[in-house]
């Protein structure tokens, strides 16, 4: 339907206006006002807050006040503690403080507006673009580029204070040389009571010596190849031995006879260790496996596999990791005895790991190989690396630690080093002098152990002798 405007005379005044199909006028006005606010609201600050957003803010504030009304203020005791004497404040950097107090017109980061301003004022000197303006360039250049601050000096003093000084350790001297073996002395074990010690050598004989006099007390024969490991039980009168003939034997020291054999290794057995609190024996050998034995039933409880080369040394302790093994594949593995699985593999060594030593009281151990930085200290139970023992450039065959934090390392070339275990610094170097007696006598240290008091050190070497070193009072 269409309508037309007519004049009083009845004639039409113009074209007809179609009223149908047009949107309501109120909707058009509302849409136009919204566009106007969006375009001009930023300059005129006339944009009104949306009612729904304001209502949500009020609702959230009310819920927070209701939810946390009981914990908004601290109890009087805690308030008194927080308002106590304040500690030393962290020193502030002058450059940051100066830039913060320069005023609101100072901009730390330059933008397009800053570039326009600099181009419009040619008299202005161009400054370096940096996050924080450095206001001591003259002094920095005058000191030759070595700007010192209170913060750096404080850090240096703190670092110097952290350095641990080594303990004083008396000197060690050779006090006795014992001969009697007809081959290289490859294994030594100390009696828990420090009355006697046992040695094994390439002559396939185990000899038991009196520690005080150095006299031979007993010789045990039974192995048919070089003896590589010895261990004395702390809780039983048993002596355990392993050799390159794949045999692991248990000797009864009351009858001086073999009472048990442990069969399972496919090649020579190079090391063994007795658990201090369990009736468990651990061995490692050339078949790259670590085997866990029941001491009484001779059962092979676990065969721990993972090494890819000869296992050079194994150690046990009564806390995790209860078994530690070092191998010719340049790795040290920490084993979980309860699960029979590897807990961690340490790959810091570059060459074969030949020796391990566990600290008697501190929760740590050391490992040794050949080459530079060849002795490393680790923290149990994760095997966290602590530090290197630098200075013994040789193939390390044996390590021993006593309760007075003295670490001994013996090498293939006959050099001996005594270290302060806490700092990793050497305090004495010795040289193994080969004793005359045969044409093939040469310098070289293969095994070592401290007695229970930590004042005597026993070593076995390539000159077929046993040497006893004593701490000088």
UniProtKB/Swiss-Prot annotation:
Signal peptide range: none
Compositional bias (Polar residues): 1-14
Protein origin, superkingdom: Eukaryota
Alphabetical keyword list: Cytoplasm, mRNA processing, mRNA splicing, Nucleus, Repeat, Spliceosome, WD repeat
WD repeats: 180-219, 222-261, 264-303, 306-347, 349-388, 391-429, 440-473
Cystine pairings recorded for this chain: none
Record-linked Pfam families: WD40
Family named by the database record: Belongs to the WD repeat PRL1/PRL2 family.
Known partners and oligomeric status: Associated with the spliceosome.
Full protein name: Pre-mRNA-splicing factor PRP46
Organism classification: Eukaryota, Fungi, Dikarya, Basidiomycota, Agaricomycotina
């Amino acid at each position: 339907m269409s309508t037309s405007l007519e004049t009083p005379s009845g004639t039409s005044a113009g074209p007809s206006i179609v009223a149908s199909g047009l949107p309501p006028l109120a909707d058009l006005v509302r849409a136009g006002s919204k566009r106007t606010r969006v375009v001009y609201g930023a300059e005129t600050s006339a944009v009104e807050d949306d009612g729904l957003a304001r209502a949500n803010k009020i609702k959230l504030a009310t819920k927070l006040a209701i939810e946390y009304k009981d914990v908004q203020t601290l109890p009087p005791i805690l308030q008194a503690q927080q308002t106590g004497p304040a500690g030393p404040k962290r020193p502030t950097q002058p450059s940051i403080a100066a830039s913060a107090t320069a005023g609101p017109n100072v901009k730390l980061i330059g933008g397009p507006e800053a570039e326009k301003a600099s181009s419009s004022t040619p008299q202005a000197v161009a400054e370096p673009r940096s996050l924080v303006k450095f206001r001591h360039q003259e002094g920095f250049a005058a000191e030759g580029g070595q700007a010192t601050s209170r913060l750096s000096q404080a850090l240096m003093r703190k670092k110097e204070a952290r350095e641990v000084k080594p303990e004083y350790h008396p000197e060690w001297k050779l006090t006795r040389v014992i001969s009697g073996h007809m081959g290289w002395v490859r294994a030594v074990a100390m009696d828990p009571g420090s009355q006697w010690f046992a040695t094994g050598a390439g002559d396939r004989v185990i000899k038991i010596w009196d520690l005080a006099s150095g006299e031979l007390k007993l010789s045990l024969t039974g192995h048919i190849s070089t003896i590589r490991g010895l261990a004395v039980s702390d809780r039983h009168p048993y002596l355990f031995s392993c050799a390159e003939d794949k045999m692991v034997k248990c000797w009864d020291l009351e009858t001086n006879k073999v009472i048990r054999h442990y069969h399972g290794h496919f090649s020579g057995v190079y090391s063994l260790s007795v658990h201090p609190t369990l009736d468990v024996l651990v061995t490692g050998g050339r078949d790259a496996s670590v085997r866990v034995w029941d001491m009484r039933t001779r059962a092979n409880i676990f065969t721990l596999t993972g090494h890819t080369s000869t296992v050079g040394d194994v150690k046990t302790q009564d806390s995790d990791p209860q078994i530690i093994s070092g191998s010719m594949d340049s790795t040290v593995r920490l084993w979980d005895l309860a699960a029979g699985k590897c807990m961690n593999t340490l790959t810091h060594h570059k060459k074969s790991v030949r020796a391990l030593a566990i600290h008697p009281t501190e929760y740590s151990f050391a490992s040794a190989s050949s080459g530079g930085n060849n002795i490393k200290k680790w923290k149990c139970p994760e095997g966290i690396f602590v530090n290197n023992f630098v200075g013994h450039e040789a193939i390390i065959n044996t390590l021993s630690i006593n309760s007075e934090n003295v670490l001994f390392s013996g090498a293939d070339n006959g050099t001996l080093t005594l270290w302060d275990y806490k700092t990793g610094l050497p305090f004495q170097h010795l040289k193994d002098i080969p004793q005359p007696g045969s044409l093939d006598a040469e310098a070289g240290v293969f095994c070592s152990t401290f007695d229970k008091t930590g004042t005597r050190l026993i070593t076995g070497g390539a000159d077929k002798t046993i040497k006893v070193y004593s701490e000088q009072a």
